[in-house]
Amino acid sequence: MIPGEILPGEDPVEINPGRPVRTVLVRNTGDRPVQVGSHYHFAAANPALDFDRDLAWGHRLAVPAGTAVRFEPGVEREVDLVPLTGARIVPGLRPESAGPLDGRAVRAGGAVRAGGAVRAGGAVVGDSPAATPGTTGATGDLPGYLGEGS
């Protein structure tokens, strides 16, 4: 064994076991690629991404920790989201989602989340009907994730 060496097991690793999953259709309406990290509050992602932000409220990408999903300009793709857990308080990030994720209304930086919609400047942000609820986690190939054997 080499000091610091990681010896992963043979079996696949289940990601987010037992967590409910939502599938959301996302389109990058901007002219530049957008990358969203694994634990970022997805409803607060770059405004150039068009998707149902209400459905994404309180959720993050269902991908391994430390990874990200890249959205190319003009391209649509489906992503799976899982609920943020723990205290469910978002520290900072974007003003429209900073603070507690649960409650009757959340206000920050001129944006309001009330009645199930994320509103900024009086307009609902995002409105995609293509979202479906689902159930739990995917499995991943840990050696592949660690960059071994690729």
Swiss-Prot record:
Q: EC number(s) for this protein?
A: 3.5.1.5
GO CC entries: urease complex
Gene Ontology biological process: urea catabolic process
Q: Which keywords accompany this UniProt record?
A: Cytoplasm, Hydrolase
Pathway(s) annotated for this protein in UniProt: Nitrogen metabolism; urea degradation; CO(2) and NH(3) from urea (urease route): step 1/1
GO molecular function terms here?
A: urease activity
Name its cellular compartments: Cytoplasm
**Highest rank taxon of the organism:** Bacteria
Query: SUPFAM superfamilies this protein is in?
Result: Urease, beta-subunit
Q: Which InterPro entries match?
A: Urease_beta-like, Urease_betasu_sf, Urease_subunit
Q: Which reaction does it catalyse?
A: urea + 2 H2O + H(+) = hydrogencarbonate + 2 NH4(+)
The record, for Pfam families, names: Urease_beta
Positions of region (Disordered): 122-150
Q: Where is the composition biased (Low complexity)?
A: 122-140
Gene3D superfamilies, A to Z: Urease, beta subunit (2.10.150.10)
Q: Which residues cross the membrane?
A: none
Q: What is its main location?
A: cytoplasm
How does the annotation summarize its subunit structure?
Heterotrimer of UreA (gamma), UreB (beta) and UreC (alpha) subunits. Three heterotrimers associate to form the active enzyme.
Q: Which family does it belong to?
A: Belongs to the urease beta subunit family.
Protein name in the entry: Urease subunit beta
- What organism does this protein naturally occur in? Frankia alni (strain DSM 45986 / CECT 9034 / ACN14a)
